[in-house]
Design a protein with these regions (language model features):
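All-alpha amphipathic helical-bundle segments outside canonical DNA-binding/catalytic cores
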Residues: 143-159
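Amphipathic, non-membrane alpha-helical segments in soluble helical-bundle scaffolds
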Residues: 44, 96, 124, 153-158
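Catalytic activation segment of kinase domains across protein kinase-like and atypical kinase folds
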Residues: 75-112
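Catalytic-loop of the protein kinase fold
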Residues: 67-69, 74
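Active-site activation/catalytic loop segments of kinase-like enzymes and analogous catalytic loops
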Residues: 100-142, 160-178, 193
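Regulatory N- and C-terminal appendages and interdomain linkers associated
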Residues: 173, 177-208
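A cross-family kinase active-site recognition segment
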Residues: 1-51, 55-66, 86, 93-98, ...
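Soluble or luminal CAZymes and related metallo-dependent hydrolases
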Residues: 46, 122-126, 147, 186
Length: 208
């Protein structure tokens, strides 16, 4: 992932895709799907407030905009044990986005998709170790505990946006997709986890 995040665009750096895509998803949910929403899904007015809060809160974190996979769940990671190589597949959602979103989204995916279990979300110490290796691989030099802690805070805050993004996406899929999957249930799970961890994650402070 660190190597992918070092891919640069020619010329000026593109704007992150996160807010544009989430706004489009929300608009679709509001205008075309709202009447059919389940009682377990937050009201559209609540979703609109949360989207505004996310943009205001996360935009202040100064997470770098890098080339991201944006959908790095386990099935999109191929490991060649004979060569010790890892490669990623399925770049359908790839694009320039916040570094912390890509990592936070990857951590969220530890919980799985078909049988979601957020007990599998990596613990703080596991994350710190992962982020330490990530920064070292990206920079090629030693990193400080403060740098690791800073990325940890950014990642866990952007993990909130990951929940919100895929919950909106799932509502749309529930309306239009022909895939045999309970997208509505998945949307409810992601929204529930968002609200469950929001207060705790919001309280995280950047290191001085």
């Amino acid at each position: 992932m660190a190597k992918i995040h070092t891919i640069h665009a020619n010329g000026s750096l593109p704007r992150p895709t996160l807010w544009h895509k989430m706004h489009n998803y929300f608009t679709l949910v509001k205008n075309e799907i709202n009447p059919s929403l389940s009682a377990d899904v937050p009201k559209v007015e609540v979703l609109e407030q949360e989207l505004a809060w996310l943009k205001e809160h996360l935009s202040q974190l100064e997470s770098p905009v890098v080339f991201c996979h944006n959908d790095l769940l386990c099935k999109n990671i191929i490991y060649d044990s004979t060569k010790g190589h890892v490669r990623f597949i399925d770049y359908e959602y790839a694009g320039y986005n916040y570094q912390a979103f890509d990592i936070g989204n990857h951590f969220n995916e530890f919980a799985g998709v078909n049988e979601v279990d957020y007990c599998l979300y990596p613990a703080r110490e596991t994350q710190l170790q992962w982020l330490h290796y990530y920064l070292q691989a990206q920079r090629g030099v030693a990193v400080t505990p403060r740098e690791v802690e800073r990325l940890y805070v950014q990642v866990n805050k952007f993990a909130l946006a990951s929940h919100f993004f895929w919950a909106l996406w799932a509502l749309i899929q529930n309306q239009y997709s022909t895939i045999d999957f309970d997208f509505l249930r998945y949307a409810v799970i992601r929204f529930n986890q968002y609200f469950k961890v929001k207060r705790q994650v919001s309280a995280l402070e950047m290191p001085k």
